[in-house]
Amino acid sequence: MSDFAYPLHEECGVFGIYDRAGTEDVAAAAYSALYALQHRGQESCGIAVNDDGVITGHRDLGLVNEVFTPEVLASLSANTAHMATGHVRYATAGTRVRANAQPMIVRHGRGTMALCHNGNLTNAVELRRQLENEGAIFHGSSDTEVICYLITRNRLRMGSIETAISKTMDVLEGAYSLVIMSATKLIAVRDPRGYRPLCIGTLPGGGYVFASESCALDAVGAALLRDVEPGEIVVVDTKTGELRSIKDHCGRPDTQMCVFEFIYFARPDSVIEDSSVHEARKQAGRFLAQEHPVEADVVIGVPDSGLDAALGYSQESGIPYGIGFIKNKYIGRTFIQGSQKQRENSVRIKLNVVSSTVKGKRVVLVDDSIVRGTTSARIIKLLRDAGAAEVHFMVSAPPFKYPCYFGTDIPDQKLLVATGRTLEQINEVIGADTLGYLSNEHVVQLAKNAKCGFCTACFTGEYAVEPESVLSTDIHDRHLNDRPKDAKKLGE
């Protein structure tokens, strides 16, 4: 990632498991899965287990290994627990409170529900106001709590939780991939436009797994079955052990999966929409080589997400691939989030140049994006200080110009280096010999097997859903109609 001081962040990762055979420690399985999904959220995490219909859980601020000590994990393990859900969350600093950690457990007149959410509602302010006017009391500031209230209210009026979920989907706008656990059911839900990924796996001894990415299935020994379709509700009923699909909200022609899942967010060993993330990133590099050919001696990538695209650029161009940087694996998040002086030093501490790879050579440098531009400039300076003769910066995504309202934490639009600048002006900021971005035409062709369309609003400013709020994930910070003046709904 180009900007270590102010990186892009995915909001969350979700997981759920039903072990029909009763041979799995489902709490331990959830722990392993959350480890695999840690890249999707590092602020808080949680696990809820279903012990013979009784749902309990633990959630807190911190990384998976910090929150779930052996003692905590042991307290969640039970011989009769056949179901569990898990969640990792990223949030802005202002919302880093335990009340927003998930799974959220709700107890009501019809039972108990644990809910995990990845995404961001665009009408959360309006829905929350309506609920508050009806007497609802909120304990946190996330839109996940809004979803919980709506499902609970509908459940009290309807015969099944899946019917209540379907009714709730009628009023939700924006991005949501959910894993929900009741006393007898494990349920996966994906919004009708399919903004965030969600997949289904099968356990070798019988049972099912839901997860944001297939890498979490691999972590628990499950086999990838398929993706949850946009708009689909998938229900595992523990009374029968069967998998049922409800498709009342399926079939929208304007599916909008976040294309940045393939560019940066997802782990390269994951498969999303029948497409390898690793291969999609290599394809981005191939397209870059076709669009922006240069004469050079070596191609290198910025660890970690720039490496696959760099390999693709090398393969397409015939320019040798090299290891240009060694990444410090032990630098902590506290360092990056510290003082301004620490931010200035973060690139040099986190990355060190392999001088023998670049000294005296014309270098093609590949990264997944440029956010503010300051970190890209420092990386280029590191290469020049190590003796690189030329540095040609290639970006495996189009320029970031607009905020995201669907679950990606993008810095203030005014801080985005591409906003209001030409390609030449951006290059003046970062100081490369040449600069090339992947085109909008090619970015939607990265996952050739995908059945859904892609959201590229952060590049184009064209939103499939009317933007409602400012960038904060904190619902208190959102204001109706507060959106960029040049942002528009698709088709406008």
Locate the predicted segments by residue.
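Phosphate/diphosphate-binding loops
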Residues: 167, 215-216, 223-224, 231-232, ...
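Short, glycine/charge-rich flexible loops or terminal/linker lids adjacent to PRPP-binding catalytic cores
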Residues: 318-363, 374, 401-407
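Secondary-structure transition/capping motifs at alpha-helix termini
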Residues: 136, 157-158, 293-297, 315-322, ...
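Conserved short alpha-helical segments that host acidic/polar catalytic motifs at enzyme active sites
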Residues: 1-230, 235-238, 242-296, 302, ...
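A conserved beta-strand->alpha-helix junction
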Residues: 140, 145-148, 321-332, 427-447
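Flexible loop/turn segments at secondary-structure boundaries
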Residues: 92-93, 123, 187, 195-196, ...
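Generic beta-strand/beta-sheet core signal
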Residues: 116, 181, 189-190, 201, ...
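PRPP-dependent phosphoribosyltransferase catalytic core
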Residues: 169, 184, 221-223, 227, ...
